[in-house]
Amino acid sequence: MPLLSRRCFFSSAGILFAPPLNPTLFSSDSPTNEKVAAVRPLPMSTIFKGEDRFHAIVKKASEENWRELPIGERIIKCARELHGLPYENFTLEIDDHIESPSVNLEGLDCWTFFEQAMGLARMISIEKEKYTPEDLLREIEFTRYRGGVCTGNYLERIHYLAEWFFENEARGTCRHLTPELTGAERIHDRRISEMTVLWKSYRYLKNNPELREPMAEWEARVAAMPVYHIPKAKVPALEPQLQNGDVIGIATKHHGGFCSHVGLAIRTDDGVTRFMHASRNYRKVVIDKSVSGYLNQFSSHAGILVGRPLEVSETV
């Protein structure tokens, strides 16, 4: 399983040493706040695919009253509606120049799988007479971009998974559990370079060379970040503490990034806490082995990072 590829193998890192977040952006429980919603510079046909599936999920959620479920259970309900969808590479590279929030419910990579399941779950927690694709795009914008806002700049997007954990904890959408879990260990001396080394694989970096130097500066911040993981050998003892809908980052032993993959924890009827993810190997979204069993399939896997999504009413 190669590391340095956007094929769902996302270098994970944080932005602790980045400029401070603007607290005025986080004064609402929901990205329906006007300060969060952005004008969409690209056509809806480019930024939103799978509208029929979107409406089918919304209809089912309404009929079965998913809104009353805890956020983790709601995420898994949404994730199950994505089960079996095809794996697709580079789903976020939708334009040569303009960055925009986007949704693709026809094909998913590992990042967009967990992100869209969480976005749908957050969206339906806010009671509305009718949901539109724009509602989901706002949720995606709120969690995908630094400060919860995209103005069209590629560098606004969170490109490394642990950055997502730290950014979203600051915003109150996800609790970053990893550092406080028993057995957590810091990953030291990690080179972060996936985006700049593989710039030819990314439409925006390939077509806008002026972005590469500032991307390298972000990677330098990322490399200095105190990122913790739960080592592989300690994960079996941790599995009973994992909850449905927890975001599970797969820590890697290789340089280039902190993580190589991401998915969701799901407890199945047999009582096993499994790893649900958009799989390159299976070419679709699958409910896989136990989290520890999945880790043990690959010698490059070092362990896991864990984030627990929070209810919309719990955001700051």
Q: How should these model regions be labeled?
A:
Residues 88-220, 277:
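Acidic/His-rich structured neighborhood in mature extracellular/periplasmic domains
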Residues 62, 66, 71-84, 92:
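Sequence/structural signature of beta-propeller domains
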Residues 214-240:
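Mixed-charge, Lys/Arg-rich low-complexity intrinsically disordered regions
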Residues 60-68, 97-107, 252:
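Second-shell loop/turn segments in exported
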Residues 249-306:
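C-terminal soluble interaction/assembly domains
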Residues 23-56:
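C-terminal segment of N-terminal export signals and the immediately downstream linker at the start
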Residues 2-3, 8-29:
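N-terminal export signals
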